[in-house]
């Protein structure tokens, strides 16, 4: 049985790897996700002199934020990274020094693009199909356009979270038409009606629900950009394209960590520009403080 260490012990463990890193990066998730984070962050900062060879997963979001708030060790630059989650839609979080909140549902959202999906399919397929054939089979934009109803679903997840204090994030397989690996919009619509009915049964008025929905629709248009931002990349978008690859290119069984690791190797990094700035800024601020002292 694997020993589970406390957040404090995980933080202290970073000391033993300081020589390998210019900055200490703390994240959510588990040890199994290290390769994914390191690959992504190394690509992100490769044109700088910053070294990132390790990251330090601390567990859930609350643990990461708590660790950041209580971290008074200023010997080295550090950055704590947390997901935007469902709160991205309706809550303005207080700023915390050395804490970076992603502006999408989770870190996995950033590795989804046509290049990463199709390159992964090409490699896993062993090159049997040309890249042009892969792109035609996958039809990346078509898959996303057919999945825009997930934006509405996540609007209602967030309304449920804001008003009721919790929501049930069912896996995307619950919304699949498994015959052709696409989102079944009727199933999505039925689930939205269930959420509405549940809220009304808890005495939330239709007027309040409509007002809450309008606020979200005004903030996030119904577009692919919004889909890639507010719908969970980990539980929805990556599994969506895993199923598409399995149905349209080649059938292969991989753990979820392997899929996102493959995507992280070739994904477009433009949407991670602000995170790159935050990493560079954390290093510069530390250097400036050291110079002043």
What are these regions (language model features)?
Residues 1-293:
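Acidic, divalent-metal-binding catalytic cores of TOPRIM
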């Amino acid at each position: 049985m694997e020993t589970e260490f406390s957040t404090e012990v995980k933080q202290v463990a970073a000391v033993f790897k300081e020589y390998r890193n210019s900055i200490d990066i703390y994240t959510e998730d588990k040890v199994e996700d290290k390769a994914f984070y390191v690959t992504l962050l190394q690509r992100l900062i490769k044109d700088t002199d910053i070294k990132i060879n390790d990251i330090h997963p601390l567990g859930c979001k609350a643990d990461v934020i708590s660790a950041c708030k209580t971290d008074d060790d200023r010997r080295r630059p550090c950055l704590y990274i947390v997901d935007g989650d469902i709160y991205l839609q309706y809550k303005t979080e207080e700023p915390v020094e050395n804490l970076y909140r992603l502006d999408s549902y989770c870190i996995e959202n950033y590795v989804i693009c046509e290049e990463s999906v199709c390159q992964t399919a090409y490699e896993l397929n062993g090159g049997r199909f040309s890249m042009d054939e892969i792109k035609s089979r996958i039809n990346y934009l078509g898959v996303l356009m057919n999945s825009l109803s997930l934006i509405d679903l996540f609007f209602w997840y967030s309304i449920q979270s804001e008003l009721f204090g919790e929501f049930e994030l069912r896996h995307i397989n619950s919304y699949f038409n498994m015959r052709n690996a696409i989102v079944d919009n009727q199933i999505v619509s039925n689930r939205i009606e269930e959420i509405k009915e549940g809220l009304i049964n808890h005495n939330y008025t239709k007027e309040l629900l409509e007002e809450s929905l309008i606020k979200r629709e005004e903030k996030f248009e119904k577009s692919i950009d919004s889909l890639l931002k507010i719908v969970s990349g980990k539980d929805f978008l990556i599994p969506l394209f895993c199923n598409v690859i399995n149905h349209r290119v080649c059938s292969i069984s991989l753990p979820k960590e392997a899929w996102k690791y493959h995507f992280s190797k070739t994904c477009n990094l433009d949407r991670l520009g602000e995170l790159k700035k935050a990493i560079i800024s954390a290093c510069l601020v530390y250097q400036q403080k050291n110079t002043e002292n």
